[in-house]
Amino acid sequence: MTLIHMNIFMAFTMSLTGFLMYRSHLMSALLCLEGMILSLFILVTLTVLNLHLTLAKMMPIILLVFAACEAAIGLALLVKISNTYGTDYVQNLNLLQC
């Protein structure tokens, strides 16, 4: 395992730890999820480039598309919860009736 891969794995682990510890606010959870997705994107891109996989060159782009969709849906939920309840607590997601 190279130093770059270890740093990316540590970034993913720190984001996962932050997601598990600070999950009471939706904004914190979304930021940690974005950190996880970005570290996965960099790891997949480096793996595809290092192994010269021609069939898997679309995988990082597909991962970015899913990350953009996740961010858009998360921000839409954040705006809806903030407008409805005035806070961004994750516990309000159970009360949201769309």
Curated annotation (Swiss-Prot):
Gene Ontology biological-process entries: ATP synthesis coupled electron transport
GO MF annotation terms: NADH dehydrogenase (ubiquinone) activity
Gene Ontology cellular component terms for the protein in this record: mitochondrial inner membrane; respiratory chain complex I
Catalysis performed (reactions): a ubiquinone + NADH + 5 H(+)(in) = a ubiquinol + NAD(+) + 4 H(+)(out)
Lineage: superkingdom: Eukaryota
Membrane disposition: Multi-pass membrane protein
First-listed, main subcellular location of the protein, grouped into a coarse class: mitochondrion
Cross-referenced Gene3D superfamilies: 1.10.287.3510
Uppermost EC category: translocase
Listed InterPro entries: NADH_UbQ_OxRdtase_chain4L/K (IPR001133), NUOK/Mnh_C1-like (IPR039428)
Enzyme Commission code: 7.1.1.2
Subunit structure: Core subunit of respiratory chain NADH dehydrogenase (Complex I) which is composed of 45 different subunits.
Function summary: Core subunit of the mitochondrial membrane respiratory chain NADH dehydrogenase (Complex I) which catalyzes electron transfer from NADH through the respiratory chain, using ubiquinone as an electron acceptor. Part of the enzyme membrane arm which is embedded in the lipid bilayer and involved in proton translocation.
Family named by the database record: Belongs to the complex I subunit 4L family.
Protein name: NADH-ubiquinone oxidoreductase chain 4L
Recorded name of the encoding gene: MT-ND4L
